[in-house]
């Protein structure tokens, strides 16, 4: 028979024993890392997203005049040095260390002032290997290899962030279910809609001029290819630096802000009426962010609702609320097909079809809805990739791969169009820029864009139509569909880095600078890519993201270049090789640690 007193006594004894055990466990708990020097402990990868970063904790010290140097590895290693400002010290409660090598005992020197006394300390920071979580039988390598071809004196300190990707074993798994036609039966399959299948794992890193990885964004930061969750799927693109030294980016149904320490500062879902963000995010001088998206449940003239493809620009504030919308289906002409029918069927942006490479695309009236080449809001008619913001008149400049380069004001009126004349309706044709030579004399060009007795050329299937601080426009001219046709042989194609001067008052365009045509097919990059003028070294930086794309079974080359503006000499050339064959890269950009830790 169970005695109530014995039960109480037993319960009390057990409770006392557990209490003593718990108290002992707390008293004997594992200790935190102890100070590594005169400051605090070192924490590698403090936010869990950037394993080649670390923090030296302040441990309640008040310091200033901070400088960090991550020493190069071996005799030829590239040191990474930068100052750390008051704001960064307060933000991280420590000294941010950027530019570590993977799986290496990194030598780091920190200089600072405390209580008026100059201090200098040396540390050794151990890192682990970085890991590609998406490998399969197609993998050529675990990480994307690099090949340094040339680095001129004076450019050794350059660091390049590569925004590329790797195929997942399962491929694209999702699509939006579109609205059925009114004549469709109950059991008839619904059509695809939107661009949800645009889904691939990110591969984001910084490379130095020795070809070494010096930063890595963990693939799980924004993406999860192992879970059926569309909020963690998409295509991480449009990584652009803000004035604060942070970065914005888009992926699928979200847009983000993060820093180089791996801290995610903002994670916003797209506003309710929009979906499928890819290609671009850019912060304006007003502190707002421009995003390239599609429209959810767009109603066509026949009453059918569709999700549009890459033809909407939204401006959002830092809380994610919509400030403005540019609906290109109403501003441009979604039925213009002059370039669409001239494209290489083997590659439309990052959608690659090797079996039809080199063949001219055929536009069929019954082309399926969704992310398919064709006219109408329900198809990939515009394909806007990068965006530029012109603060002088509060306007945007869009690179529409399938239409041309267009400047549009905040009033939604087209200011000018840079494209061949063929196929534009009367209203838009009046906005076409007229080509002129260096003296302002008109050039003779046919409607397909072929010009006589000049080296002027329009850009075709272009990327990154960005403004320079000189007021000129730099464009990566991919060159597919040049003169609105496919050449007799694919090897006749070429890509260019181009600079144009736009005279908005007179409606003219003048060629100023070009590079790449002379390098021929070996330099041809049919899709993606970027160029940008670099004032600090007077160079044109370029990343040709899809060289070698159609060579079956071979890695695709993403070629990093800096070209001297005056002489056109190659100052930097580094190849990035995809880890799986025929897998394109997207973009790259220069990063400056001095600007990231103010």
Swiss-Prot record:
Gene3D superfamilies assigned to the protein according to its UniProt record, in alphabetical order: Arylsulphate sulphotransferase monomer, N-terminal domain (2.60.40.3100)
pH note: Optimum pH is 9.0 using p-nitrophenyl sulfate as a donor and phenol as an acceptor substrate.
Catalytic residues as annotated in Swiss-Prot or TrEMBL: 463
Annotated InterPro entries: Arylsulfate_ST (IPR053143), Arylsulfotran_N (IPR035391), Arylsulfotransferase_bact (IPR010262), AssT_Enterobac (IPR028610), ASST_N_sf (IPR038477)
Superkingdom of this protein's organism: Bacteria
Cystine connections: 445-451
GO MF annotation, one: aryl sulfotransferase activity
E.C. code: 2.8.2.22
Signal peptide residue numbers: 1-27
Root EC class: transferase
Positions of 4-methylumbelliferone binding: 279, 383, 463
Pfam families assigned to the protein according to its UniProt record, in alphabetical order: Arylsulfotran_N (PF17425), Arylsulfotrans (PF05935)
Keywords: Disulfide bond, Periplasm, Signal, Transferase
Catalytic activity of the protein: an aryl sulfate + a phenol = an aryl sulfate + a phenol; 4-methylumbelliferone sulfate + phenol = phenyl sulfate + 4-methylumbelliferone; 2-naphthyl sulfate + phenol = phenyl sulfate + 2-naphthol
Record-stated family: Belongs to the aryl sulfotransferase family.
Subunit structure comment from the entry: Monomer.
Protein name: Arylsulfate sulfotransferase AssT
Source organism per UniProt: Lelliottia amnigena
Taxon lineage: Bacteria, Pseudomonadati, Pseudomonadota, Gammaproteobacteria, Enterobacterales
């Amino acid at each position: 028979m169970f005695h109530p007193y014995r039960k109480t006594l037993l319960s009390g004894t057990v409770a006392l024993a557990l209490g003593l055990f718990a108290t002992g466990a707390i008293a004997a708990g594992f200790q935190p890392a102890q100070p590594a020097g005169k400051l605090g402990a070192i924490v590698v990868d403090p936010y869990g997203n950037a394993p080649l970063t670390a923090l030296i904790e302040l441990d309640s010290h008040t310091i200033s005049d901070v400088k960090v140097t991550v020493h190069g590895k071996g005799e030829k290693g590239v040191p990474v040095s930068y100052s750390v400002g008051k704001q960064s010290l307060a933000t991280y409660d420590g000294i941010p260390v950027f530019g570590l090598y993977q799986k290496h005992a990194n030598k780091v020197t920190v200089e600072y002032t405390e209580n008026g006394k100059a201090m200098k300390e040396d540390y050794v920071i151990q890192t682990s290997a970085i890991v590609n979580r998406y490998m399969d039988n197609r993998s050529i390598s675990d990480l994307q290899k690099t090949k340094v071809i040339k680095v001129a004196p004076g450019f050794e300190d350059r660091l390049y962030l590569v925004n590329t990707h790797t195929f997942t074993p399962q491929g694209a798994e999702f699509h939006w279910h579109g609205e059925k036609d009114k004549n469709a039966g109950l059991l008839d399959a619904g059509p695809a809609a939107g661009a949800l299948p645009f889904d691939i794992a990110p591969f984001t890193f910084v490379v130095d001029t020795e070809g070494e990885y010096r930063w890595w964004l963990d693939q799980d930061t924004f993406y999860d290819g192992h879970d059926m969750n569309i909020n963690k799927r998409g295509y991480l693109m449009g990584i652009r630096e803000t004035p604060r030294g942070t970065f914005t980016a888009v992926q699928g149904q979200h847009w983000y802000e993060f820093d180089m320490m791996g801290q995610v500062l903002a994670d916003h879902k797209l506003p309710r009426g929009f979906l499928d963000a890819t290609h671009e995010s850019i912060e304006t001088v007003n502190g707002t962010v421009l995003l390239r998206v599609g429209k959810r449940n767009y109603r066509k003239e026949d009453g059918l609702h569709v999700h549009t493809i890459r033809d909407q620009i939204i401006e959002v504030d830092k809380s994610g609320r919509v400030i403005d919308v540019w609906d290109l289906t109403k501003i441009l002409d979604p039925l213009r097909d002059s370039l669409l029918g001239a494209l290489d069927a083997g590659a439309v942006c990052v959608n690659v079809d090797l079996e039809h490479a080199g063949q001219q695309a055929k536009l069929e009236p019954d082309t399926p809805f969704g992310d398919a080449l064709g006219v109408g809001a329900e198809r990939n008619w515009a394909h806007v990739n990068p965006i530029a913001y012109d603060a002088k008149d509060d306007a945007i400049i869009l690179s529409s791969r399938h239409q041309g380069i267009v400047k549009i004001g905040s009033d939604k009126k087209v200011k000018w169009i840079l494209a061949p004349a063929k196929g534009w309706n009367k209203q838009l044709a009046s906005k076409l820029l007229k080509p002129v030579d260096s003296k302002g004399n008109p050039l003779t060009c046919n409607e397909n864009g072929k010009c006589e007795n000049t080296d002027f050329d329009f850009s075709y299937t272009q990327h990154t139509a960005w403004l320079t601080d000189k007021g000129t426009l730099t464009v990566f001219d991919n060159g597919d569909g040049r003169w609105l046709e496919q050449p007799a042989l694919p090897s006749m194609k070429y890509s260019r880095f181009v600079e144009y001067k736009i005279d908005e008052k007179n409606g003219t365009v003048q060629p100023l600078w070009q590079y790449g045509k002379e390098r021929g097919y070996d330099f041809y990059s049919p899709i993606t890519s970027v160029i940008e003028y670099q004032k600090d070294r007077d160079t044109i930086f370029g990343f040709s993201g899809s060289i070698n794309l159609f060579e079956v079974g071979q890695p695709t080359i993403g070629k990093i270049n800096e070209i001297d503006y005056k002489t056109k000499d190659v100052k930097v050339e580094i190849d990035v090789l995809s880890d799986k064959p025929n897998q394109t890269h997207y973009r790259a950009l220069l990063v400056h640690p001095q600007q990231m830790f103010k």
